[in-house]
Amino acid sequence: MTSTSNLIEQVIEAWQNMQAKTPLVQCITNSVAANYTANVLLASGASPAMIDNPYEAESFTKISSALSINLGTPTSEQMQAMQISAKTAQLNNVPWVLDPVGYGPILAWRSQMTDELLQFKPSVIRGNASEISTLAGNQVQSKGVDSTLSSDQAYQQAYVLLAHADCIAISGESDYILSRELDAVIQVNGGSPLQPKITATGCALGALIAAYSAVTTPTIAALSAHIHFAIAGKLAANQAQTMGSFSSIFMDYIHMLDANLIEQYADIKLLDKQA
């Protein structure tokens, strides 16, 4: 039976493997998040490549360690690249993460494109509570791309999405990870209320899941990335209470994370899986 200590051991191993292998992560992401996402990946030990041109997508996805697709500010050309790269990833066993930013009836075009991307079976679907709940077929009133639903409400509605992906990761006050392979739901605690106030933290989290998925299973990848962010947020909040200083120290701890910090500060709980 899975235990929290065993899961944390696997997270430490995943972190060590990422430092050793420096996975190449292709990011098709939004214009707001691209720079921050690249910096988070570099600070974490991965190698980002922001390749979102449809004419280069197939060849680059083939050589990538992992793929991150984020629908934050999609253009027609980006959408072509997303479809090409997602299909290529599926055909070449490249793990990939789908972040359905803003999914819902208000942003209908991107939502239709998100639905089409599901056919290529992402390794992980990551989003906030409103995005995940709406993607699962529930009617949720969102506030732009921000969530109006709590993560503990959303995870109970998200099981249907396991038909499309190996793992579902939901971020919020506590984070929740659902998986085909586990007989429990993982709750990740930590972080800081300041994290959602920094532009692109959620988007960067999706890319970090992709980086970890290059060196471990989808479930441990999602767990590793969420623990990575939760610890960095918690430790940064101990030193800074304002957004500017918090943002800087948060990035420092993204870079400074190590096995000892994971062992000391990882705060996870196993919940019964819905029947």
Swiss-Prot record:
Query: Any idea of its EC number?
Result: 2.7.1.50
Which Pfam families does this entry report, sorted A to Z? HK
| Reaction(s) catalysed by this chain's protein | 5-(2-hydroxyethyl)-4-methylthiazole + ATP = 4-methyl-5-(2-phosphooxyethyl)-thiazole + ADP + H(+)
Output the Gene Ontology terms for molecular function: ATP binding; hydroxyethylthiazole kinase activity; magnesium ion binding
* Pathway in which the depicted protein is active: Cofactor biosynthesis; thiamine diphosphate biosynthesis; 4-methyl-5-(2-phosphoethyl)-thiazole from 5-(2-hydroxyethyl)-4-methylthiazole: step 1/1
SUPFAM superfamilies named in the record: Ribokinase-like (SSF53613)
List cofactor names only. Answer: Mg(2+)
Q: Which InterPro entries match?
A: Hyethyz_kinase (IPR000417), Ribokinase-like (IPR029056)
Q: Which residues bind substrate?
A: M50, A200
Keywords, sorted A to Z: ATP-binding, Kinase, Magnesium, Metal-binding, Nucleotide-binding, Thiamine biosynthesis, Transferase
What GO biological process, any one, is recorded here? thiamine biosynthetic process
Q: At which positions is ATP bound?
A: R126, S171
Tell me its family.
Belongs to the Thz kinase family.
Record's HAMAP family? Thz_kinase
Q: Which NCBIfam families match?
A: PRK09355.1
Job description of the protein: Catalyzes the phosphorylation of the hydroxyl group of 4-methyl-5-beta-hydroxyethylthiazole (THZ).
Q: What is the name of this protein?
A: Hydroxyethylthiazole kinase
Q: Which gene encodes it?
A: thiM
